[in-house]
């Protein structure tokens, strides 16, 4: 009986370790993708391993996505720390809906607004590009943000105000 109890404890510990490993892999695994933005410029995630990179997976019809997008946090961070700032940060907007199109991103009927005007960072979505990128991530709904660190690890992070959000970037393991 004594050994059966010890074996049971060991099996429980192994099972728990395996479950936690699967959760960690789903939440924080490295994603590698190449996609064209709506201007047909190609982006390869492997070119951004030297900086923190935010991937915002949203949908053109999503109200909470629109509220986050128009809140200005990503634009401010991109301006201050992106390619035209300190160049230590990159942002990608991904319209994960397979029906995404240039006209929908420009605010056509069926979209909650014009995603293009005032957006300085790449918008990936039309022609299935956004859905293809989104398929590399495990997420439960829109909007979802992933922060790639220099190591390629991309944990899901919360939407927040600029400096709290920047703290996540600073804590990003490089």
Give residue spans per PLM region.
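Short, internal strand/loop/helix patches
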Residues: 107-142, 146-147
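Bacterial N-terminal signal peptides
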Residues: 11-23, 27
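Non-catalytic, surface beta->alpha helical segment in thiol-disulfide oxidoreductase systems
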Residues: 140-141, 147-174
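N-terminal "domain-start" segment that seeds a small globular fold
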Residues: 23-48, 67, 122
């Amino acid at each position: 009986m004594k050994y059966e109890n010890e074996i049971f404890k060991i099996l429980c510990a192994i099972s728990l370790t395996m479950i936690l490993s699967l959760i960690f892999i789903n939440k924080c695994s490295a994603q590698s993708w190449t996609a064209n933005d709506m201007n047909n410029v190609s982006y390869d995630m492997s070119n951004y391993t030297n900086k923190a990179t935010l991937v915002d997976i949203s949908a053109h019809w999503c109200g909470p996505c629109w509220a986050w997008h128009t809140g200005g946090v990503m634009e401010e961070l991109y301006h201050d720390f992106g390619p035209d700032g300190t160049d230590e940060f990159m942002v990608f907007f991904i319209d994960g809906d397979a029906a995404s199109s240039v006209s929908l991103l420009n605010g056509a009927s069926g979209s909650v607004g014009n995603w293009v005007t005032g957006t300085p960072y790449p918008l990936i979505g039309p022609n299935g590009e956004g859905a293809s990128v989104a398929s590399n991530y495990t997420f439960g709904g829109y909007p979802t943000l992933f922060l790639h660190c220099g190591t390629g690890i991309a944990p899901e992070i919360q939407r927040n105000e600029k400096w709290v959000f920047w703290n996540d970037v600073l804590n990003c393991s490089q």
